[in-house]
Amino acid sequence: MARTTFLVSVSLFVSAVLARTVEYGLKISDGEIAPDGVKRNATLVNGGYPGPLIFANKGDTLKVKVQNKLTNPEMYRTTSIHWHGLLQHRNADDDGPSFVTQCPIVPRESYTYTIPLDDQTGTYWYHSHLSSQYVDGLRGPLVIYDPKDPHRRLYDVDDEKTVLIIGDWYHESSKAILASGNITRQRPVSATINGKGRFDPDNTPANPDTLYTLKVKRGKRYRLRVINSSEIASFRFSVEGHKVTVIAADGVSTKPYQVDAFDILAGQRIDCVVEANQEPDTYWINAPLTNVPNKTAQALLVYEEDRRPYHPPKGPYRKWSVSEAIIKYWNHKHKHGRGLLSGHGGLKARMIEGSHHLHSRSVVKRQNETTTVVMDESKLVPLEYPGAACGSKPADLVLDLTFGLNFATGHWMINGIPYESPKIPTLLKILTDEDGVTESDFTKEEHTVILPKNKCIEFNIKGNSGIPITHPVHLHGHTWDVVQFGNNPPNYVNPPRRDVVGSTDAGVRIQFKTDNPGPWFLHCHIDWHLEEGFAMVFAEAPEAVKGGPKSVAVDSQWEGLCGKYDNWLKSNPGQL
């Protein structure tokens, strides 16, 4: 995970007198790689997977020039980048989702994202937000350091080596998987940590050539920034023989919480401290998939004091048996819809019915977990400004968001509507409106709901699909307070604060304040489900987007994106 060259020098832990502009360059290209030992064509960032670590300090401004060098017609050739978790105050034009806040960047063109970081700190990531493109490799870590980190006394080491970006992996392109209409091909074949993994762990040695290796010194404490950059996979993360102390979730510092392991869904981030307090040896960093059978991401933790030649860990790496509910999900005979995020209209989903019958004998038997302390997400207490967004008062506006699956078409829906990308980006529609933005300005398929400004909003997110899987739901432009999980008692005093929350059919209730005008995408972070319609847009205070102290001011390069994209479509009809 090589770091790009800074154009402006940044001191990580020395408080700056003035905020700086930190510049990066990302070249998006096609190339052949084999992160798990099997070669495939992928979408690369600066020639690699994952992309380089982007980092800066609290208060800095990021300027990231993205150059599109994509040429392979069997892959997506246009692109856009989303900066997951960054709030983008007055900056919705650089949030990144194609056809929501911008038109895509076409081949042989570039676009520079300028992002004031303001008071945000923590662990984030960036990824393509064009159809399912990030599945093919366009993803990387992003960290905003706090020179006055309130947890600084808890760790000794926090650098690029302790950033762990985990991701599921496929041996065929996402475009081909979507075109097949076969749900069984949505199952990842392996998983990686910092771009290394083993497709066939039983016949591939575990060593620093095949697995990411973190070297530690006995007695030191390491801040691990764990990022789940997966398309669908959720993981249970642990370090063999060591406890971990959770200190942040989704960029929000939390009260320290010591556990043996924690679950992390697609899009989520967990910061934890591990103390190197065991006998010098080699230990597994384990991340078995909890929603896909018989797959595990691994890395190695090696004590520098162990002077012996390299040797693998003594014990087997942790395996995990998926629940019967997950087996039921992969056994469901439902069609797989596609084509809803094209942005150019006219695509009709060609769907093939698919099912995968998993015999119980093929699933690893569940290990005895009675002595393992696993993080309870409901116990994540924000370190600063705890409390629900609405306080003890009722929300100003309560919206029920019920997700479900149309088994006939294979499309996921929210409140009965599968989202489909518009031809004109939502933000552009808002900015060019002359007579007051209303919901009638958007088609039913765009599924855009207007939120009033400076109000406390409550979403009741629940499902009626009957499919027992946890959906990682993400809202751009905000963090939210999770005041209730399922039928558990609500918590308005110190609820968890995140930007991705897992929801089953039983549901969750979340609260946030509409203090950030812009069109913000809400969607399932299982990218197949997003592509199949599990999304909608909240146009927050649209009149304030057009004018006033919180307005979004676009520049000429942003204004030129759609014209370039329209011209590209003329010679590449029906493509992305």
From Swiss-Prot:
Optimum pH is 6. Its EC number is 1.10.3.2. Keywords: Copper, Disulfide bond, Glycoprotein, Lignin degradation, Metal-binding, Oxidoreductase, Repeat, Secreted, Signal. GO terms for molecular function: copper ion binding; hydroquinone:oxygen oxidoreductase activity. In mycelia, at a lower level than LCC4. SUPFAM superfamilies: Cupredoxins (SSF49503). This is Laccase-1.
